[in-house]
Swiss-Prot record:
Alphabetical GO biological process terms: cysteinyl-tRNA aminoacylation
EC numbers, comma separated: 6.1.1.16
Known partners and oligomeric status: Monomer.
Protein name per Swiss-Prot or TrEMBL: Cysteine--tRNA ligase
Record note on cofactor: Binds 1 zinc ion per subunit.
Gene that this sequence comes from: cysS
Single GO MF descriptor: ATP binding
Short sequence motif 'KMSKS' region: positions: 264-268
Length: 465
C-alpha cells in the first residue's frame, strides 16, 4: 500500500511505526461557524482514509481537534455578546450534527485546545528554555532561524520567505518569519496565567501539543487541507521537532481544494456553501460520491450539475441493490453450478481491482469506477434463475466495497425515501420561485415511478400507487 507523502513529494510504501496500528491526526475546524462544504471535502477524504485503513485490518487511533480559542471566535463571541466558551459549545454541537449527516465516523478523540492549556504552557516553556523561542513584553515567538530545516514541508526557502514577510512586520521580532506561540492578553479577551503573564496560545502550538499528548512524539499520519501546508503544518514541524529532536510525523497527507467558479471555496472569499445547505438537497451518499469522484490530491469543481449526476449514480447503485434483494427473496435454489462458481471468482477479482486502486494512494475515483463496472456485470449476469448464494454474494460484495467510501450502507427503503424527500424539497423550492415547469416535471417524474404527491394544508405527502 502506497501513499503520497507531502514531505518527500513522492509516493511511499506505508509502514506504520507499530505493526497493525495507525496513529492519525487531522486538523479539525475552528468552531465559530458551520463548516462549509470545502472543509467537508477534507473531513470526508480523511474519514475515507481511516475507514480504508480499518478495512485493511489496522487499528486506527484517529484524533481530530477543535480549535476553540481563536481571533475569529473572540470577534464573533463579542459581536453576539456571549462567551467564547458558549460559542464553541454551540458550534461543536453543530459540527457533530453535520458530520453525522455526512456519515463521517466519530473520531477516537476530539480534543479542544482549551483543555490542554497546562500542557501548552509547558510546551512553550521548554522551547524558551532550549533557546528556540523568546519572550517580548508578554508575547512569545518561535525563532524560525534556529530550526535549520524550516521550509522542508512546503519546499520554500527561508530567506525568500523572510523577504516576503517584511511588509507590516512586528519590529520587535528577531526575524520576519518568527511566529507567535503565546499571545499577550488584549482587553476583552479570554486569557490564562503563564510565566509570561496573562495570555493565550497561538494556533500552531495548539495542534502540536494535542498531537504530542495524545499520540506521542512521532505520529504515523498528519493530515489536513492543502492550505494548511504553509504556514500551519510547517510551523507545527518546527516547534515539535525542536522540542523532541524527533520527526513529528512519518507521513503528511493533504487534500486539494474544492473550487467554485474555479476559485477556492472559502469563508474569506464569501463564495461558500455550508455542508448543512447542501445536505438539505442531497443525502450523504450523494455528497460523498461526488467528493470521492476525484482523487483527493486533485482539485474538484463544485456544481449543481455534478451533484445531480452523483445523485443519479447513487440511484443506479441502490437500484442494483434493490433488484438483488428482490431476487434473493424470490429464488429458492441454493446450490452453485460450475459457471456460478467461476462467477464468484470473477466478483472476487473486482474486489482485488478495487483494493489495488485504493492501495495506490487512496485512489477513490478509480475504485468507484471498479464498483460501477462490477454493478454492470452483475446486472447482466445475475438473473432470476441464479442461485440464491450468488445473489447474496453479489449483494455482500457491493456493500463491502461501499463501506470504506462511507456509501451504500443504507437499506434500499431508506435510500428511496431520502431520495423522494429530496425531490419533494426541490419541487417546493421551485414552487416558491414560481418555476412551475420544474415543479411539474418533478411531480410527473415521481408519478412515473409510482409515487403520487398530495398537497395538503400540513405540507406535501406522498404515497405509492
Amino acid at each position: 500500500m502506497k501513499l503520497y507523502n507531502t514531505l518527500t513529494r513522492q509516493k511511499e510504501e506505508f509502514i506504520p511505526l507499530k505493526t497493525g496500528e495507525v496513529n492519525m491526526y487531522v486538523c479539525g475546524p475552528t468552531v465559530y461557524n458551520f463548516f462549509h462544504i470545502g472543509n467537508g471535502r477534507t473531513f470526508i477524504v480523511f474519514d475515507t482514509v481511516r475507514r480504508y485503513l480499518e478495512y485493511k485490518g489496522y487499528k486506527v487511533k484517529f484524533v481530530q481537534n477543535f480549535t476553540d480559542i481563536d481571533d475569529k471566535m473572540i470577534k464573533r463571541a463579542n459581536d453576539e455578546g456571549i462567551t467564547v466558551k458558549e460559542l464553541g459549545e454551540r458550534f461543536i454541537g453543530e459540527y457533530y450534527k453535520d458530520a453525522d449527516s455526512l456519515n463521517i465516523e466519530r473520531a477516537t478523540v476530539n480534543p479542544r485546545a482549551t483543555e490542554f492549556m497546562e500542557e501548552i504552557i509547558q510546551f512553550v516553556k521548554e522551547l524558551v528554555d532550549k533557546g528556540y523561542a523568546y519572550e517580548i513584553d508578554g508575547d512569545v515567538y518561535f525563532h524560525t532561524k534556529r530550526f535549520n530545516e524550516y521550509g522542508k514541508l512546503s519546499g520554500q526557502n527561508i530567506e525568500d520567505l523572510q523577504a516576503g514577510a517584511r511588509i507590516n512586520v512586528d519590529e520587535r521580532k528577531k526575524d520576519a518569519m518568527d511566529f507567535a506561540i503565546w499571545k499577550k492578553q488584549k482587553p476583552g479577551e479570554p486569557a490564562w496565567e503563564s510565566p509570561w503573564g496573562m495570555g493565550r496560545p497561538g494556533w500552531h502550538i495548539e495542534c502540536s501539543c494535542m498531537a504530542h499528548n495524545l499520540l506521542g512524539d512521532t505520529i504515523d499520519i498528519h493530515a489536513g487541507g492543502h492550505d494548511l501546508i504553509f504556514p500551519h503544518h510547517e510551523n507545527e514541524i518546527a516547534q515539535s521537532e525542536c522540542r523532541t529532536g524527533k520527526p513529528f510525523a512519518k507521513y503528511w497527507m493533504h487534500s486539494a481544494f474544492l473550487n467554485i467558479d474555479n476559485k477556492k471555496m472559502s469563508k474569506s472569499l464569501n463564495n461558500f456553501f455550508t455542508a448543512r445547505e447542501i445536505l438539505e438537497k442531497y443525502d450523504a451518499d450523494v455528497v460523498r460520491l461526488f467528493m470521492l469522484s476525484a482523487h483527493y490530491r486533485a482539485q474538484l469543481n463544485f456544481s449543481e450539475e455534478l451533484l445531480q449526476s452523483a445523485m443519479s449514480a447513487v440511484e443506479r447503485l441502490y437500484n442494483a441493490i434493490y433488484n438483488l434483494e428482490n431476487l434473493a427473496n424470490e429464488v429458492k435454489r441454493n446450490d452453485l453450478n460450475e459457471e456460478e462458481k467461476k462467477y464468484i471468482k470473477k466478483l472476487d477479482e473486482y474486489r482485488e481491482k478495487y483494493i489495488e486502486k485504493m492501495d495506490d494512494d487512496f485512489n477513490t475515483a478509480d475504485a468507484i469506477a471498479v464498483i460501477f463496472d462490477m454493478i454492470r456485470d452483475i446486472n447482466s449476469n445475475v438473473k432470476s434463475d441464479s442461485s440464491k448464494k450468488i445473489i447474496e454474494y453479489a449483494l455482500s460484495i457491493i456493500r463491502e466495497l461501499g463501506s470504506p467510501l462511507g456509501i451504500l450502507q443504507k437499506s434500499t427503503e431508506e435510500s428511496v425515501e431520502d431520495e423522494i424527500q429530496q425531490l419533494i424539497d426541490r419541487r417546493e423550492k421551485a414552487r416558491t420561485e414560481k418555476n412551475w415547469a420544474l415543479a411539474d416535471e418533478i411531480r410527473d417524474g415521481l408519478k412515473e415511478r409510482g409515487i403520487l404527491l398530495e398537497d395538503t394544508p400540513q405540507g406535501v405527502r406522498w404515497k405509492r400507487i
